[in-house]
UniProtKB/Swiss-Prot annotation:
GO terms for biological process: cell cycle switching, mitotic to meiotic cell cycle; female meiotic nuclear division; male meiotic nuclear division; mRNA stabilization; oogenesis; spermatid differentiation; spermatogenesis; trophectodermal cell differentiation. GO terms for molecular function: RNA binding. The keyword Electron transport does not apply. This is Probable RNA-binding protein 46. Interacts with YTHDC2, MEIOC, MOV10, CNOT6L, DDX4, UPF1 and PABPC1. It comes from Mus musculus. Its main location: cytoplasm. Pfam families: DND1_DSRM, RRM_1.
Amino acid sequence: MNEENTDGTNGCSKVRTGTQNEAALLALMEKTGYNMVQENGQRKFGGPPPGWEGPPPPRGCEVFVGKIPRDMYEDELVPVFERAGKIYEFRLMMEFSGENRGYAFVMYTTKEEAQLAIRILNNYEIRPGKFIGVCVSLDNCRLFIGAIPKEKKKEEILDEMKKVTEGVVDVIVYPSATDKTKNRGFAFVEYESHRAAAMARRKLIPGTFQLWGHTIQVDWADPEKEVDEETMQRVKVLYVRNLMISTTEETIKAEFSKFKPGAVERVKKLRDYAFVHFFHREDAVAAMSVMNGKCIDGASIEVTLAKPVNKENTWRQHLNGQISPNSENLLVYANKEESHSKSLGKPPTLPTRLNGQHSPSPPEIERCTYPFFPGTKLTPISMYSLKSNHFNSAVMHLDYYCNKNNWAPPEYYLYSTTSQDGKVLLVYKIVIPAIANGSQSYFMPDKLCTTLEDAKELAAQFTLLHLDFNFRRSSINSLSPVSTTLSSGTPSMLPYTSRPSSYPSYPLSPTISLANGSHVGQRLYISNQASFF
């Protein structure tokens, strides 16, 4: 421990010696009865607390705390977080110098206490002018395994992963959208703990590990979205996956209406999955239990309640399952143990104005700045000489996509209308000249935006979706097609196959839809289809 640390409590700069630090921590331990141990760059207070019997608290009981002053320690932090409830474990990340690393994890005994901590302590002024951030901590136990031979079955993948890694609980494998006898070339491997998943990733990550003669790709799977129980109790939409490409919305509606005619409000289908809207929640829940595992057009379907995207402004970007602990921005992330050296975290790519819509996040992109020293040699290049993972916006991806297919650049046409409350609303129509004579003459989302940037980004996302451009970590399920998808006669295209998410989601609150054209300006194309949500 350092001999001296600067304590800025009450806005003054006073020096607290290492001996004083130690005395303060010992006093805290004596007062609470908790043990404290330092290991692997973190100091653990409790875990379990005195008198605890039984297993640790379940997933969802831990919160992440960011932007902690570097000279603040458990004797000051623990009393603050005890206001929300009983602390099971407090883990403060530490530097070799004895300072903390600016962030910590607090595990409560119940989920309710963790949620209360987020509500009352996020943006809490811990010292004059110093505000901490508190959000849910996602304990990721799932790895993404890519480049798997498509003919391998779930049992084969499970057996192989158990041979090469420890703690494997389950493997999630999804059938191909076009051939249900094959997998999609990737799987999600569930481990018994985050530590087991981290050890497996460490073993497999070098890039030289092979399964069945194939060099596999390994990364943290995107953590499943946590939605509070109160919100889920209002969900009336089912997410249906593993459908045949040829299955129509009419067929899906008919199948889900069999148990109670008239219960289904509408169906929206994209490729091999769909959202089934019900008028009443109880009918949705009943249909889920009846239809899960049933066959439609020869395909065994999976049915779950669709998870809304939280419309609140949260920090959600993670870097390979890990936050940047030095960042001044608070980031929700998936991994908890290994530090990340980058000092500038990746900001959200598209604001919550689009209600959960996010620009494509290319594989392993790193958003950070580096020093630009005088005399640094620079070489002129074309953006088209770069790889797709150098672009972060859908607009740039679409331009890149067209160039790689030897198409002319996309043409953007801006339209506007005025809302009932007088706001100017915008939407872009995109024309791709190379395919304009095909079955899809243009692309236009059925949502209106209030800013030019959002309108352009949304239109590009919509277009990429209908060009079979798969986003790696985005959910763009609220976009409805304007007309039929591209025909098989479309000019050959360079595919951009990316890692899909392991969970469904949909916007909790939609942007303004074009489905009702009563207030739409004269120049605006009006979609005759209702929006997703």
